[in-house]
Amino acid sequence: MTAIAHDAFIYGYPTVDLYSILYKYAVDASSREYKAPLNTIYNTRRVATPEDRAIVAPNCDTPYSYAWLDLRAEPLVLSLPPFEPNRYVSLMLVDLYTYIVGYVTPRTNGNVGGDFLIVGPGWQVNTFPGIKRILQAPTQFVLALYRTQLFGTGDTAAV
């Protein structure tokens, strides 16, 4: 029985841990880690410091924007502006199993930006008018992490 308990812990821990982050970031407004409600983008205007502990080892030269997406009722559209050709930007989507289920970057889409439909489990949509790409997650909650390269402290207003 000990081996089964150990295996269950190893299997389930990432999901429980990520849900804990979801709760601190988007549900419990009294948490010191609280960012914004579900389906709302929170933008940081600074790079990560050692005090930022909810997510392990974020980049120290890319301010982050966060959004916990709740796909239980319906899909969501994330709109991204055109990307500057010389600046690293990315949108990474992470499901509750901690798998990356989608990436939007200049390498995957070019620098033009666009509207991206994020759908949860069970949605059977292949195309949608005005949507550049459809990204499907196997879980009903998805973490959207936006990264924008910072070219030094004087560049903060640009990101």
Model-identified regions with their sequence ranges:
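A compositional/structural signature for long, glycine/proline-rich flexible linkers
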Residues: M1-V159
